[in-house]
UniProtKB/Swiss-Prot annotation:
GO terms classed as biological process: gluconeogenesis; glycolytic process
Pathway membership, UniProt: Carbohydrate degradation; glycolysis; pyruvate from D-glyceraldehyde 3-phosphate: step 2/5
Name used for this protein in its record: Phosphoglycerate kinase
Gene: pgk
GO molecular function per UniProt: ADP binding; ATP binding; phosphoglycerate kinase activity
HAMAP family to which the protein is assigned, alphabetical: Phosphoglyc_kinase
List of residues binding ATP: 202, 319, 345-348
Organism: Photobacterium profundum (strain SS9)
Catalytic activity as recorded in UniProt: (2R)-3-phosphoglycerate + ATP = (2R)-3-phospho-glyceroyl phosphate + ADP
Length: 392
């Protein structure tokens, strides 16, 4: 997948009028007391749905929601709250179809939401018979859920292999374009920022990025392992002694600026006082929770000179006010940068919201696991399927 332009059919290039269009969206939103509590994913999918309706297509949209027992209907995981939301957002009569696998009737310009795909036996295993039933419902299959593109399931992969036409929806196409721009042929220097608690969970990401980034910035618990690799005491900080040698190797392969000063405390507590120390002064009972001001300034300078920025993970315990300065400084530098920036991952999005820089990031990825697997250089099954169908 790396180093080449992905060739897929785009929904925006197709004639949709009168066609039965099956959209696999990501409408996996939090629901409380029958109401959608965070509508970000629905909002992201609305332009695709509207475009199909305005073109006069017969529109079906579906998604998973939560983790119900497969093959069993469970009202707690119904897409009914999403249907209610769409009724208001689109100002039209949106129906919910529970039993649709043997066919469904709808008119041009009409929208039907097909109930949670995980209520169908065989969804997760990419069952061939189920995939063919989905495919029989439509003339055009639209894959628009980047967040599930790394899973080969019946509604993300199998249906596309069997549908008459399989294409990428606008949301997915934009995502692939932005990630491709950041990783396949980036304007340089490319600066990658990887935060998080453990090197082990991000090891393949770090190894992959060390090969393409001009500077690889590490933060959070990951940074502590690199500080230890430079021979410094990290006290009681979260770090992985067994990966110190791996960190040393990564530092040989790529420019990784390691913190020179850090914010420490004696306990993991929101009200703990942040004490700024040079890395050589960290004591046995200290815990490192953030970058110090000097290190943050150095990284901000590196980011300001970048032409491409890839951000995944905060650089400190930004949820605590006393340990948010490092992540806030990184966020501000990205916001002020004139380079092309892509950010992804749950904690990263929370940091973007907290520091109010959403409008200043060039592209915010909607996929957690899919974003990481793309960055690792892995082939995403749904994307591979779209590429294969584009050749046919």
């Amino acid at each position: 997948m790396r180093g080449r332009t992905m060739s897929v059919i785009k929904m925006t290039d197709l004639e949709l009028a009168g066609k039965r269009v099956f959209i696999r969206a990501d409408l996996n939103v939090p629901v409380k007391d029958g109401k959608v509590t965070s509508d970000a994913r629905i909002l992201a999918s609305l332009p695709t749905i509207k475009r199909c309706l305005e073109a006069g297509a017969k529109v079906m949209v579906t998604s998973h929601l939560g983790r119900p027992t497969e093959g069993e209907y469970n009202e707690e995981f119904s897409l009914a709250p999403v249907v209610n939301y769409l009724n208001d957002a689109l100002d039209c009569d949106v129906k919910l179809a529970k039993d649709y696998l043997d066919g469904i009737e709808l008119n041009a310009g009409e929208l039907v939401v097909l109930e949670n795909v995980r209520f169908n036996k065989g969804e997760k295993k990419n069952d061939e018979a189920l995939s063919k039933k989905y495919a029989a419902l439509c003339d055009i299959f639209v894959m628009d859920a980047f967040g599930t593109a790394h899973r080969a399931q019946a509604s993300t992969h199998g249906v596309g292999m069997n549908a008459a036409i399989a294409c990428a929806g606008p949301l997915l196409a934009n995502e692939l374009e932005a990630l491709g721009k950041a990783m396949d042929n980036p304007a340089r220097p490319l600066v990658a920022i990887v935060g998080g608690s453990k090197v082990s969970t991000k090891l393949t990401v770090l190894e992959s990025l060390s090969k393409i980034a001009d500077q690889l910035v590490v933060g959070g618990g990951i940074a502590n392992t690199f500080i230890a690799a430079e021979g410094h005491n990290v006290g009681k900080s979260l770090y992985e002694a067994d990966l110190v040698e791996t960190a040393k190797k990564l530092m040989k392969d790529c420019a990784i600026p390691v913190a020179t000063d850090v914010a420490c405390a004696k306990a993991f507590d929101e009200n703990a006082e942040a004490v700024i120390k040079h890395v050589s002064e960290v004591q046995d009972d200290d815990m490192i929770f953030d970058l110090g001001p000097d290190s943050t300034a150095v990284l901000a300078e590196i980011i300001s000179n970048a032409k491409t920025i890839l951000w995944n993970g905060p650089v400190g315990v930004f949820e605590f006010k006393n340990f948010e300065a490092g992540t806030a400084g990184i966020a501000k530098a990205i916001a002020d940068s004139e380079g092309f920036s892509v950010a992804g991952g749950g904690d990263t999005l929370a940091a973007i919201d907290k520091f109010g820089i959403k409008a200043d990031v060039s592209y915010i990825s909607t996929g957690g696991g899919a974003f990481l697997e793309f960055v690792e250089g892995k082939v995403l099954p749904a994307v591979a399927m779209l590429e294969e169908r584009a050749k046919a």
